[in-house]
Amino acid sequence: MDVTLDTMFRGRLVVRQEKGGYRFSVDAVLLAGLAGVQSEDRVVDLGTGCGIIPLILAYRKKGRSIVGLEIQSDLAELAEWNVSTNRFSDRIELRNLDFRKVS
């Protein structure tokens, strides 16, 4: 898989994502910024992709715990790398599964 290494917030957030195919855009950044998430909320991100929304929420100290669900294993691997590299493993949990099977 060909990937790029991008940064946000003046280099304080590092994000690895596919060079082609699914890449996050300004929509995900706006959604994370406009979400009415408080510091003690629990959050689930369905179809988390590379984990950009949980990463932004954790960076902005929103959400006590965040779970990202991703069905595509290659994207789930990128999300795991991003969470670990940015040291948010204590607040973000990622699962490689089909959210339709969550009960």
Give the ranges of each region predicted by the language model.
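Conserved SAM/SAH cofactor-binding pocket of Class I
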Residues: G33-S103
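Class I SAM-dependent transferase core
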Residues: M1-Q38
